[in-house]
Amino acid sequence: MVQAWYMDNSTEDQRLQHHRTPPKFIDMNELFKRTGVEYFKVNEKDPVNDDLLIKLKKERCYSYEDEITCSEQCLPNYHEKLKNFFTEHLHTDEEIRLVLEGSGYFDVRDPSDEWIRIFVQPGDMIIIPSGIYHRFTLDDKNYIKAKRYFIGEPVWTPHNRPADNMPCRQEYLGKLLKGF
């Protein structure tokens, strides 16, 4: 089951949990209200035939999908890619990920610019809105396999912070003010 919490400010190994003392957890409804990040639980034993996933793909027009495996054995330029994934950035399109195997962390900024860490495992699907600053890292198991979904041709272009003048960032900030 997915968990989310506010992170400490430690610069220790990014693959650790980084809980505050005491821990400050946040549930998925509150995460959505504060950030626009959506969470869905998909049947981890048969995710591609999951009714919820099929419905989401149709409603949101996800027309392209692929898989990514992040491990030292499977990902070319592993260390460089992980460094890029963990650099704070945003995208012009929403980022949709369904975890098939393994686990990892998506970190997103809240309205006060604090980090919220989202721990994802098989069956967890998250949708990170366009324009939100975020990053990704593996946990201490160093392995994740995930489906990626796109509308049309896949575009995965990170725009590193600062990117506050980008239209997608301005649109995101507007939604943040009005509420998701």
Swiss-Prot record:
What cofactors does the UniProt entry give for this protein?
A: Fe(2+); Ni(2+)
Gene Ontology molecular function: any one: nickel cation binding
Record's GO cellular component terms = cytoplasm; nucleus
Q: Pathway membership of this protein?
A: Amino-acid biosynthesis; L-methionine biosynthesis via salvage pathway; L-methionine from S-methyl-5-thio-alpha-D-ribose 1-phosphate: step 5/6
Q: Which reaction does it catalyse?
A: 1,2-dihydroxy-5-(methylsulfanyl)pent-1-en-3-one + O2 = 4-methylsulfanyl-2-oxobutanoate + formate + 2 H(+); 1,2-dihydroxy-5-(methylsulfanyl)pent-1-en-3-one + O2 = 3-(methylsulfanyl)propanoate + CO + formate + 2 H(+)
Q: Matching SUPFAM superfamilies, A to Z?
A: RmlC-like cupins
Which positions does UniProt annotate for Ni(2+) binding?
Answer: 89, 91, 95, 134
Q: State how the cofactor is bound.
A: Binds either 1 Fe or Ni cation per monomer. Iron-binding promotes an acireductone dioxygenase reaction producing 2-keto-4-methylthiobutyrate, while nickel-binding promotes an acireductone dioxygenase reaction producing 3-(methylsulfanyl)propanoate.
InterPro entries according to UniProt: ARD (IPR004313), ARD_euk (IPR027496), RmlC-like_jellyroll (IPR014710), RmlC_Cupin_sf (IPR011051)
Top-level lineage group: Eukaryota
Where does it reside? Cytoplasm; Nucleus
Q: Which residues does the annotation say bind Fe(2+)?
A: 89, 91, 95, 134
Disulphide connectivity of cysteines: none
Q: Which UniProt keywords apply?
A: Amino-acid biosynthesis, Cytoplasm, Dioxygenase, Iron, Metal-binding, Methionine biosynthesis, Nickel, Nucleus, Oxidoreductase
- One GO BP annotation of this record: L-methionine salvage from methylthioadenosine
Query: EC number(s) for this protein?
Result: 1.13.11.54, 1.13.11.53
HAMAP family, per this entry?
A: Salvage_MtnD_euk (MF_03154)
Function according to Swiss-Prot or TrEMBL: Catalyzes 2 different reactions between oxygen and the acireductone 1,2-dihydroxy-3-keto-5-methylthiopentene (DHK-MTPene) depending upon the metal bound in the active site. Fe-containing acireductone dioxygenase (Fe-ARD) produces formate and 2-keto-4-methylthiobutyrate (KMTB), the alpha-ketoacid precursor of methionine in the methionine recycle pathway. Ni-containing acireductone dioxygenase (Ni-ARD) produces methylthiopropionate, carbon monoxide and formate, and does not lie on the methionine recycle pathway.
Similarity comment = Belongs to the acireductone dioxygenase (ARD) family.
Q: What is this protein called?
A: Acireductone dioxygenase
Query: From which source organism is this entry?
Result: Pediculus humanus subsp. corporis (Body louse)
- Identify the taxonomic lineage of the organism of origin: Eukaryota, Metazoa, Ecdysozoa, Arthropoda, Hexapoda
